[in-house]
Amino acid sequence: MPNAIRIHNFGGPEVLQWESVDLLEPGPDQVRVRHTAIGLNFIDVYERTGLYQGQLPIVPGREAAGVVDALGSRVKQFAVGDRVAYVASSTGAYSEYRLMPADRLVHLPDGVADQTAAAMMLKGLTAQALLRQIHRVRKGETILIHAAAGGVGLIALQWAKHLGAKVIAVVGSEAKAALVREHRADHVVLGHEDVAAQVKSMTGGRGVSVVYDSVGKDTFFASLDCLQPRGLMVTYGNASGPVPPIAPLELSKRGSLFLTRPTLFHYIATSRELQRAAKELFDLVLKGAIGIHVGQTYPLQYAAQAHRALESRQTTGSTVLTI
């Protein structure tokens, strides 16, 4: 029997249990994927703690890469042995095998390794949505990226530089500052500093056109103060906790600001949207415009250790669970 990580009670990393599970047969429109690499994301932590409450027991995880192991009767676009990857709107990736709808899988190009794919499906497609759909970053504009040394942040930094933007990167340590400088950040601010004051100084008092903030509660209001008039605040994560309710007048008095709290799956809702976004991501990776930094790997059965490292801000780039 195959194995999976399951959660029977919400809580700390210790609730992640390595268990035997049934090997299921695919339905007519499904593909069974034998996982080789699984991406770790903060959304996995939210699901483990119960911030995003699913029905227990839960197999966590949203992104993975692997090999097609079995096909449903109506699936024509894949064959057994094909290399595939996915990002899913539902949990289930922390497992040796998984059933997936065929229209939510993408073929992996030959030049993209399994661990690379697992490290970038959710994070890379999030970066694509942030920089190419939610706010189309333009050459010459100045943007701010929080947690710029993290999985999404490091991809977004490289993508923004490819588009010709100037990037102010906010990070949590000198080691992470060195990493984002290696990836061509124009300015670096440490998170314990007065970020808004630093940003205003770096931009001649004007501020930035857009802030991408995955940290949440601890950085939200300072992020608003980094924006120029009519700037856009994109809050897309809760690493420090959910953002508290905000009165619309707070946006008005800070310069008629715009605020959005996007979810990736609204931007890849159809198979066509998914395939288009994935192709754009893969093309940039294959041409070397974006490098995927896998900072650390753990065997799947040690997922609890990986969660502890992620929550304590000890990781850089992406973390991959291996089988």
Regions of interest found by a model, annotated:
Residues D22-G39, T49-T91:
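Glycine-rich beta-strand-centered segment in the early N-terminal region that forms part
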Residues I145, K161-T219, T270:
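Adenosine-nucleotide cofactor-binding segment
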Residues V152:
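Hydrophobic/small residue at the entry helix of a nucleotide-binding pocket
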Residues A93-E96, V171-L179, V243-P248:
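Short, glycine/polar-rich helix-capping loops at beta-to-alpha or helix-loop-helix junctions
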Residues V171, D218-A289, I323:
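Glycine-rich phosphate-binding loop and adjacent beta-alpha segment
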Residues S271-I323:
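C-terminal hydrophobic helical "lid"/dimerization subdomain
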Residues R83, T142, K166, G231-L232, ...:
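Short glycine-centered segments of the SAM/dcSAM-binding site in methyltransferase folds
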Residues A37, Y46, Q77, Y86-A149:
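NAD(P)H dinucleotide-binding glycine-rich loop of Rossmann-like/cofactor-binding domains
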